[in-house]
Amino acid sequence: MAREFSLEKTRNIGIMAHVDAGKTTTTERILYYTGKIHKIGETHEGASQMDWMEQEQERGITITSAATTAQWKDHRVNIIDTPGHVDFTIEVQRSLRVLDGAVTVLDAQSGVEPQTETVWRQATEYGVPRIVFANKMDKIGADFLYSVSTLHDRLQANAHPIQLPIGAEDDFEGIIDLVTMKAEIYTNDLGTDILIEDIPADYLDQAKEYREKLIEAVAETDEDLMMKYLEGEEITETELKAAIRKATINVEFFPVLAGSAFKNKGVQMMLDAVVDYLPSPLDIPPIKGVNPDTDEEEERPASDDEPFAALAFKIMTDPFVGRLTFFRVYSGILNSGSYVLNTSKGKRERIGRILQMHANSRQEIETVYAGDIAAAVGLKETTTGDSLTDEKAKVILESIEVPEPVIQLMVEPKSKADQDKMGIALQKLAEEDPTFRVETNVETGETVISGMGELHLDVLVDRMKREFKVEANVGAPQVSYRETFRQATQARGFFKRQSGGKGQFGDVWIEFTPNEEGKGFEFENAIVGGVVPREFVPAVEKGLIESMANGVLAGYPIVDVKAKLYDGSYHDVDSSETAFKIAASLALKEAAKTAKPVILEPMMLVTITVPEENLGDVMGHVTARRGRVDGMEAHGNSQIVRAFVPLAEMFGYATVLRSASQGRGTFMMVFDHYEDVPKSVQEEIIKKNAGEA
């Protein structure tokens, strides 16, 4: 089958936002107007097309990023609906990695909210062009220009309206297009009857003022346009559109639109903007990767004629077809039934069937082309972030960075029958979600699961019960502490055992130095002259990694440390890999005496919104929880407090805030960084873990 839509007419976009900004409803409306669904499902009724997991429909939030494809004005638009809750940031990150553009949905009453900042920052890291949709213009307190100001103040974004709303709240009745200088007036509830007319007289001055501001902002990114503007020449609609498109694709400018997805207003104009201003796969730089055979960097331009290269960005277990691997094709074409090479794992995989997904229904297709997003059935070894390529043209594409989990729970099966099922269930859930880890406590034999927050683990335990029919008892949440060294030191690890027969001999000198935060463990072999034979060096590294997993103070993993093996000795007969592994672990123990080890705790960026009269209570809460205030701002009758607070102090805070503010206060928290715990707290943690507390 030939390609249905050219690359120029393909858009891969994500829809991202803070929880409750109306993102899923916006996606629903897109599917409605592009003819993918015939009846609109409301998120708050639990009937939305994109939210297809039972927990999503119950909770009214999007947990997994469903991928769907739609058509608008002879373009194919592949949409990924991403979750807005902070516990599911990996879903957002995975999606951004494979998208070409995004629509950021704001609640027009609140403007930029904490999770908007998080997803915006992630999109900036990946260089994703964005348009902004100020949604919920029908809501009480909706203020379009306030929303635009929060983009400047909180995100320092060069964002400007390309539209203005006509009215707000119950009087929101249309939209002014600042590019065409026409008004769209909505005359029915479904937003299908639209009158295009001249701008109402009482809005004309404002429209002229904001068109001028728009031209000025865009001209700063385009020299030719700037010259015309400075010389007082008329800027045509075509020129302005082209300049907005170019500046948006270069991530120098962010167009802002207005609408109400729930009231069916502004969604079609937003779809027009997706087609007009967001990039096609041809507008973005070719994907880069490394050839595993030569270690040389290679590029894969978006073209069907190039060798096949794709990135797997999500694994999902489907109740009907089993394991689904979602992938983005960067170059080449792929037919069902063919073989590909998973270059990340060095394994050959057969593509069984290829499915084009629509929320949770599917259409089988024979071929996928460059720029497409699809799901494959039959891949056994592939996990999130793996590269799939033509066997004759290998390349490893840049993978997806996975954040470390910050919270853990103990789970135990209720019966022997549940025990076997629980192992399988946890393994499948961990395959789908790289931020979900499953470990067994070596000393107690307990199963410990870790993730990005309480809601994240709640949802996974819930899925274990529903999808895999596993009944389990769940312990109280625990903080995932870490350990690190604060001072450079050198230490010797010497292991010798000779008691008849073959002995054991390993001797190493290792220099340990603190590493930058987030860099993890780095090992360097600086042995000269073979004093530690080359074949034993990997055993030294392995010995360090294994013993660092259990720390030196309270059994938490040691992170952000460099280890340099620089001296040692060996025995011709008695030296072995095991002996050098043990010697390395002894060196680590020895180093702990002088390296000033400390315990690190996850610090959360907490954003608390309360009525003015509760501000004093909140400041007290932050101080009592070892937190520090980072900033405050007034918003209407509310105060917004931003603070860094240790995760350990935040359990149960929702109840405290609810009673202090009579249920009117809300808070959001997102992991920010790790920090040394105070000495007194460190001693308590060590005692508790030693079983003394």
UniProtKB/Swiss-Prot annotation:
Question: Looking at the record's lineage, which domain of life comes first?
Answer: Bacteria
The places in or outside the cell where this protein is found are: Cytoplasm
Which amino acids does the record list as binding GTP?
17-24, 81-85, 135-138
- GO biological process: what's one of them? ribosome disassembly
One matching Pfam family: GTP_EFTU
Main location (coarse class): cytoplasm
Q: Which keywords, in A-to-Z order, does the entry hold?
A: Cytoplasm, Elongation factor, GTP-binding, Nucleotide-binding, Protein biosynthesis
* A molecular function GO annotation: GTP binding
Q: Domain tr-type G, which positions?
A: 8-282
List the GO terms this entry assigns under cellular component, sorted alphabetically: cytoplasm
Q: Identify the stretch annotated as signal peptide in this record.
A: none
Under the heading CDD domains, the entry gives: EF-G, EFG_III, EFG_mtEFG1_IV, EFG_mtEFG_C, EFG_mtEFG_II
Which InterPro entries does the annotation name? EFG_II, EFG_III, EFG_III/V, EFG_IV, EFG_V, EFG_V-like, EFTu-like_2, G_TR_CS
Regarding protein family, the annotation reads: Belongs to the TRAFAC class translation factor GTPase superfamily. Classic translation factor GTPase family. EF-G/EF-2 subfamily.
Query: Tell me, what does this protein do in biology?
Result: Catalyzes the GTP-dependent ribosomal translocation step during translation elongation. During this step, the ribosome changes from the pre-translocational (PRE) to the post-translocational (POST) state as the newly formed A-site-bound peptidyl-tRNA and P-site-bound deacylated tRNA move to the P and E sites, respectively. Catalyzes the coordinated movement of the two tRNA molecules, the mRNA and conformational changes in the ribosome.
> Which HAMAP family does its entry note?
EF_G_EF_2_B
> What is the official name of this protein in its record?
Elongation factor G
Species this protein is from? Streptococcus mutans serotype c (strain ATCC 700610 / UA159)
Task: Please name the gene that encodes this protein.
Answer: fusA
